[in-house]
């Protein structure tokens, strides 16, 4: 009698386990699909806050985006202040902002209103744009971000508008252009033109401002550095 009961239990588990595994697999697929849709939504929102800066009057990103003399910038508040790198705007005789709005490119003159050479950051404002631009927030925990955290970079490398690259935080204790300014190392692809663009967490919050790459060929080699978000936030307040 006992053997019959044991046999029945074994048959029951054999029949149930595949069903449970299948249910778990289906749940995992649904979670992945939901996360992917959420990530896509975050990117679409973030795109509206990332601008192109042209430092070369002979370069028009609308018609010839592959040329040099381009940087990225990110809108950081309701007023429309834009954060970028110091090395993008310093000592430039020409500086113009390109912004994609309502399915068309618009370009504006800008004023440099703050410089922080030590942190390689600069603050600019747009001249003549009346409607506010969407902005991104700094992550509250930007100073506590850990190695291994998923991040993505958004910018205009080589004029390729709104290029998104995904990676992880490789280290939080690097130093960019100054031994006292901490930077984030990431393997998110960063190239020329990404400078000044945001490095973001999966919620679309700024955790860093992309600043430079370490490479022997001046192209992405999996070692990119971004000024840490908490440092950038303090820099903005001081400017």
Regions found by a protein language model. Name each.
Residues 31-38, 42-45, 65-75, 89, ...:
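Extracytoplasmic/periplasmic, Sec-exported soluble proteins
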Residues 43-50, 54-57, 79, 84-87, ...:
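Sec/Tat-exported extracytoplasmic proteins
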